[in-house]
Amino acid sequence: MKLFTLVFISLVFLCDHVFGQNPPPGPLTHTFSIVARDSLSGEMGVAVQSHWFSVGTIVTWAEAGVGAVATQSFANPAFGPEGLALLKSDKTAQKALNLLIAADDGRDFRQLAIVDSKGNVATWTGPKCIADAGHITGEQFSVQANMMLNDRIWPAMAKAYREGEGDLADRLIAALEAAQDAGGDIRGKQSAAI
């Protein structure tokens, strides 16, 4: 019990030091992910890998004919269903992202990516996401990462997705493998979802 208390207090002080304030509530899903739409088949998907156990239950959200959402960093799990609902109401990916981010007091700590059924993509990386953090948005896809070993992770993901062969699932997995090969999550790997 003493060890737990010591670790807990240390984490509180670390968060206060790193963020200058208490981090917003939300699961600590520091990770890398990709959202994408295949321009030929129209398939959409989202894939994620992290040190965080059961990462797919928080980060990945998708609905056929609607879109795909990845919510991560100090994740706001409501972004998944709310993002899909906004897409269903004929909002573009960018409009949905703008509405979600504007209404969230914890936006500076969040990372969010959305692709809609037309292939429009929108991505947000808050300025207080744990480094290394960033994203690349390409034609009908976005890759995003935070708490990474280095800043080569998301460029490696984008390159692997663009140059990948096979169906959408193959290219999503290629992006995850490229991220891991480039250094991946600074804590290691324990969980993935597609």
Locate predicted features.
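Bacterial N-terminal signal peptides
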Residues: 5-17
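Alpha/propeptide regions of enzymes that mature by internal proteolysis
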Residues: 21-187, 193-194
